[in-house]
C-alpha cells in the first residue's frame, strides 16, 4: 500500500426502523469520543436476510482496562439486566451474551458527534434496545 492511501470505510447497513429478532455474535471495545462497547448482532430483516448491526454504548474503564459497572439508568445496564437477569452488574461477563437470541429495536442513526442531523445519505441502522425473545412486557414492541 502506498503512503497516504486511504482505506475505504465499509458502508454501514440501513434497514427499516422496527423490532427484529437477532443473535449476539461478538463484542468489542473501541475508542471514539470516549470508550465505547459494541455488541455485534446478526439481525434478520423482513425479507429473511441476515444483517450485521451493533448495539453501541459508552463505558468507563479502570486503570487496568476493566469495565466499570454501568449506572442502572444507562441503556447498557438496562440491556444487560434484561438479557442476563440473574447476574449482578459487577459480575457481568460479556462473553455470556454471545449466542443469545433476542429482540432488537433498530433505529436510524441520524445525528453526528456534535448532535447535529447528518445528511440522509449518511444515516445508518443501529440497535437501540435489546430484550429476551420471550419477554413481551416492553412498550417498544407495540410501536410498530
Provide a role label for each language-model segment.
Residues 1-144:
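Short beta-rich binding modules
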Amino acid at each position: 500500500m502506498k503512503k497516504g492511501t486511504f482505506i475505504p470505510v465499509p458502508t454501514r447497513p440501513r434497514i427499516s426502523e422496527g423490532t427484529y429478532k437477532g443473535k449476539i455474535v461478538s463484542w468489542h471495545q473501541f475508542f471514539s469520543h470516549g470508550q465505547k462497547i459494541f455488541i455485534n448482532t446478526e439481525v434478520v430483516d423482513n425479507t429473511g436476510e441476515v444483517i450485521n448491526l451493533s448495539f453501541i454504548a459508552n463505558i468507563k474503564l479502570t486503570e487496568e482496562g476493566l469495565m466499570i459497572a454501568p449506572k442502572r439508568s444507562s441503556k447498557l445496564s438496562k440491556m444487560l439486566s434484561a438479557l442476563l437477569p440473574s447476574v449482578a452488574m459487577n459480575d457481568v461477563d460479556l462473553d455470556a451474551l454471545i449466542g443469545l437470541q433476542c429482540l432488537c429495536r433498530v433505529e436510524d442513526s441520524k445525528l453526528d458527534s456534535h448532535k447535529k442531523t447528518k445528511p440522509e445519505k449518511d444515516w445508518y441502522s443501529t440497535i437501540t434496545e435489546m430484550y429476551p425473545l420471550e419477554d413481551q412486557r416492553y412498550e417498544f414492541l407495540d410501536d410498530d
